[in-house]
Amino acid sequence: MKFTFVTLFQNIVEGYFNDSILKRAIQKEILEVEYLNPRDFSDSRHNKVDDSAVGGGAGMVMNPQPLFDALDELKRVDSEVHILFLTPVAKSFKQNDAKRLSKKPHIAFVSGRYEGIDERVIEKYADEVFSIGDYILTGGELPSLVICDAISRNVDGVLGNSDSLSVESFETELLEAPSFSKPEIYKNISVPSEYLKGNHSKIRSLKLALSTCKTKFFRPEQLLKHKTQLH
């Protein structure tokens, strides 16, 4: 699977792929990552990529020309590339989106800066637009990485143990049950005794109960979705 990051700040993004699971996936050629800088496509004398907002307003807006040319080149090389834009005004990215998008062969993330991207770019090139939450960041690179990570771990071969995907939060609308490590007792705090007895049927039942309690406490709306799903 190939990811293209359309960004003014490649250094912010590429460091994320220098360690751990995604680095290994790149080394195994399961994932491929490339970068496209809109500044390289600017036709202004000083490679300018932003301008003041038409109609007034604070701050600068990424102007259309560099992004139009960059994305035209991207689509010229691969007409099937799936282009994502990240903005807090869009729908929230969900686990089901990560699973669905993991089947795409090539995804591009367009990262905004300043006060955002000229809307004409989004209207022309966006296949999908997502938000990662109701808050504002200084740029789109971090949201792009969040979504890229969520997608990547659903790509076959990226995780060492693919079974771990099936028990994670949101796979059944319930949050994942609590996890514990060794030692079994630490500072007088013990792992639930049922975990230690080796009865896998009872362990599964306990995990389901703990998962349900956790969901009810932290995300009650997810519990309602789970009950609806059962019916």
Swiss-Prot record:
Keywords assigned by UniProt, alphabetized: Cytoplasm, Methyltransferase, S-adenosyl-L-methionine, Transferase, tRNA processing
Give the reaction(s) catalysed.
guanosine(37) in tRNA + S-adenosyl-L-methionine = N(1)-methylguanosine(37) in tRNA + S-adenosyl-L-homocysteine + H(+)
Give this protein's Gene Ontology molecular function annotations: tRNA (guanine(37)-N1)-methyltransferase activity
Q: Which residues bind S-adenosyl-L-methionine?
A: 112, 132-137
Q: What is its EC number?
A: 2.1.1.228
Stretches of the chain forming a coiled coil according to its record: none
Gene Ontology CC terms? cytosol
Keyword Secreted on entry = no
Q: Which GO terms describe its biological process?
A: tRNA N1-guanine methylation
Please give the InterPro entries that the UniProt record associates with this protein: Alpha/beta_knot_MTases, tRNA_m1G_MeTrfase_C_sf, tRNA_m1G_MeTrfase_TrmD, tRNA_m1G_MTases_N, tRNA_MeTrfase_TRMD/TRM10
Q: Where in the cell is it found?
A: Cytoplasm
Which HAMAP family does the protein's record reference? Answer: TrmD
Protein role: Specifically methylates guanosine-37 in various tRNAs.
Question: Subunit comment for this entry?
Answer: Homodimer.
Q: Which protein is depicted?
A: tRNA (guanine-N(1)-)-methyltransferase
**Source organism of this protein record:** Sulfurimonas denitrificans (strain ATCC 33889 / DSM 1251)
